[in-house]
């Protein structure tokens, strides 16, 4: 993988990730949003439908794909691309966040994490080395190191110990990745909770080891938005400019805009797909809650500005009807729309950076939603 940086507008960056795959060269234009395909599928969508929304890269989940279908089935197919028939780039997370989410079912030691398999209850073990081996079998174009996702709230001492162990795990991940002869990209993950000095130590340690890109982890885990913005403002300028920056597990449309505003290149989140299944649909001026009875006889499209299959063909009343009847097509049409909304937003962001008018775009984006522009956190202190 290569990262090319074309243009900046303030802290916002316009570039691309370039991947050499057996099927040819693939570019992922950045800033990019990656739909989440936890179990090797973006829920309810064929790969062709996902591609039609504008997605150029997907996220797969190492932890869940390891438990089901497992490495052996994956190897029999070739890799995850062959298994799910998506022959464009795939990023896989390392399983660290899922293990963190298990709470009391897990025990973290220096060696790795022992936990109870949520499917059948058996005790299993995941380590940095094992995560690298699973992701090698998945054929991930971008592999994430195995880390501990520091919870919120956490004391300074806990966040420090957690971050230091994540750094040791980062080195073990790098070593096993190299031993396997993996020619794909490996990203480090910056930890340190809401503490700026810990984030700095984490980044310096990762840069010393050397990675193809750097993710900001341990945000969007319950901390106030102001803390997330402050950490991004602090750490992004210190990440090597020739490497992509990835904000993990984020988020709402506003979070994408705020991330780009602070120098982030890549995002992933289940929000567009999960919200679609729950009838929360993103539109130009906010959200349509399609379950609201006021849409029962509304013959207008979901979003007149949207060019997706759903908006071009169906009314709000039809989407309301499908949801009310529990029809699978409703969830599918909602998902197509929400994914397209996210990709259109990213395309608008990229164009605004190219035209060096990103600050104006931010003002327009919030004005459409009737919201104020959030202040920059560190600028307020000076």
UniProtKB/Swiss-Prot annotation:
Disulfide bonds: none
Recorded catalytic activity of this chain's protein: 7-aminomethyl-7-carbaguanine + guanosine(34) in tRNA = 7-aminomethyl-7-carbaguanosine(34) in tRNA + guanine
Catalytic center residues: 93 (proton acceptor), 268 (nucleophile)
Annotated EC: 2.4.2.29
Keywords, alphabetical: Glycosyltransferase, Metal-binding, Queuosine biosynthesis, Transferase, tRNA processing, Zinc
Described function: Catalyzes the base-exchange of a guanine (G) residue with the queuine precursor 7-aminomethyl-7-deazaguanine (PreQ1) at position 34 (anticodon wobble position) in tRNAs with GU(N) anticodons (tRNA-Asp, -Asn, -His and -Tyr). Catalysis occurs through a double-displacement mechanism. The nucleophile active site attacks the C1' of nucleotide 34 to detach the guanine base from the RNA, forming a covalent enzyme-RNA intermediate. The proton acceptor active site deprotonates the incoming PreQ1, allowing a nucleophilic attack on the C1' of the ribose to form the product.
Residue numbers binding substrate: 93-97, 147, 191, 218
Name of the featured protein: Queuine tRNA-ribosyltransferase
Pathway: tRNA modification; tRNA-queuosine biosynthesis
Top-level EC class: transferase
Species assigned in the record: Haemophilus influenzae (strain ATCC 51907 / DSM 11121 / KW20 / Rd)
Pfam families registered for this protein in UniProt: TGT
Positions that bind Zn(2+): 306, 308, 311, 337
Leader sequence segment: none
Region called RNA binding, residue ranges: 249-255, 273-277
Gene3D superfamilies per UniProt: Queuine tRNA-ribosyltransferase-like (3.20.20.105)
Entry's cofactor comment: Binds 1 zinc ion per subunit.
One GO CC term, this protein: cytosol
Cofactor: Zn(2+)
One GO term of the biological process aspect: tRNA-guanine transglycosylation
Domain of life of the organism encoding this protein: Bacteria
Entry's family note: Belongs to the queuine tRNA-ribosyltransferase family.
GO molecular function: metal ion binding; tRNA-guanosine(34) queuine transglycosylase activity
């Amino acid at each position: 993988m290569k990262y090319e940086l074309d243009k900046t507008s303030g802290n916002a960056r316009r570039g691309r990730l370039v991947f050499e795959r057996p099927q040819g060269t693939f570019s992922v234009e950045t800033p990019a949003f990656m739909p989440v395909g936890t179990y090797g599928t973006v829920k309810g969508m064929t790969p062709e439908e996902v591609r039609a929304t504008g997605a150029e890269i997907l996220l797969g989940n190492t932890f869940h794909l390891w438990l089901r279908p497992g490495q052996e089935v994956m190897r029999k197919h070739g890799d995850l691309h062959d298994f799910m028939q998506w022959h464009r780039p795939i990023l896989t997370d390392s399983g660290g966040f899922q293990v963190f989410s298990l709470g009391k079912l897990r025990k973290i030691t220096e060696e790795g994490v022992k936990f109870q398999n949520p499917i059948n209850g058996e005790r299993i073990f995941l380590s940095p080395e094992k995560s690298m081996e699973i992701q090698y079998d998945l054929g991930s174009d971008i592999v994430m190191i195995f880390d501990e996702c520091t919870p919120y709230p956490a004391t300074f001492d806990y966040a420090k110990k957690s971050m230091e162990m994540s750094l040791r795990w980062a080195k073990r991940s790098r070593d096993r990745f190299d031993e396997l002869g993996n020619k794909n990209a490996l990203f480090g993950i910056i930890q340190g909770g809401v503490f700026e000095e810990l984030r700095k130590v984490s980044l310096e340690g990762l840069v010393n080891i050397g990675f193809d890109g750097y993710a900001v982890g341990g945000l969007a885990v319950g901390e106030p938005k102001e803390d997330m913005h402050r950490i991004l403002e602090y750490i992004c300028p210190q990440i090597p400019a020739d490497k992509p920056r990835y904000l993990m597990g984020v988020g709402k449309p506003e979070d994408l805009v705020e991330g780009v505003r602070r120098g982030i290149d890549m995002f992933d989140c289940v929000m567009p797909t999960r919200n679609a299944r729950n009838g929360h649909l993103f539109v130009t001026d906010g959200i349509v809650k399609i379950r609201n009875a006021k849409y029962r006889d509304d013959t207008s499209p979901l979003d007149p500005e949207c060019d997706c299959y759903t908006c071009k063909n169906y009314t709000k009343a039809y989407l309301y009807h499908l949801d009310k009847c529990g029809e699978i097509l409703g969830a599918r049409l909602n998902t197509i729309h929400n994914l397209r909304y996210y990709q259109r937003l990213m395309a608008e962001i990229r164009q605004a950076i190219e035209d060096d008018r990103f600050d104006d775009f931010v003002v327009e984006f919030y004005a459409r939603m009737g919201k104020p522009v959030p202040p920059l956190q560190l600028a307020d202190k000076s």
